[in-house]
Amino acid sequence: TASWRNTLVGEYVAVGAAGQRQPQGPGIEVVDSAIPEWTSTFALDWRHGSWSAAWVMRHISELREDCGNAVAYPVCSNPATGTNVLPATSYHDFQVGYRFDDFKGLQLVLGVNNAFDKDPPICLSCSLNGYDASTYDIPGGRFFYVRANLRF
């Protein structure tokens, strides 16, 4: 089974307490918060007998931000305009499971999220160690798990 979910944010307007428009919008990173223009999740599930497997790809479109005081440093991708581009990022998750026929309703699943250990892009306007934790996986974020499901 395959599924593909996409979200496009065409417009976003935030208004502050005093009624002023905030500098936030689709594709813009501002102070630890981003609204990606595109997000996409593709999932491929396979089942055969007692076995199951899945691959999920999560994609976040590129973001732009102000370089601020870092405009003079190489980490700012476009010092001429004072903007930095956080490149599009994709994460890959895999899992495999087995349903035990002797224990009706028991399934064991082994999986890994962010299988290729993709680090988030460097964010100059973010205060949390240079990345946006609300948008991206944590640095060094490969995560292994074991899950047991019991249905009765």
What is each residue range found by the language model?
Residues 25-31, 72-73, 78-84, 131-136:
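Extracellular loop and loop/strand-boundary signature of outer-membrane beta-barrel proteins
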Residues 13, 58-69, 98-152:
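C-terminal beta-signal and adjacent terminal beta-strands/loops
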Residues 42, 53, 94-96, 146-148:
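Membrane-embedded beta-strands of outer-membrane beta-barrel proteins
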Residues 54-93:
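Extracytoplasmic gating/loop element in the C-terminal half of outer-membrane beta-barrel translocons
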Residues 36-40, 88-92, 140-144:
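Residues that define the transmembrane beta-barrel architecture of outer-membrane proteins
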Residues 8, 95-100:
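Short, well-ordered turn and helix-capping elements at secondary-structure junctions
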Residues 1-67:
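Gram-negative outer-membrane beta-barrel transporters
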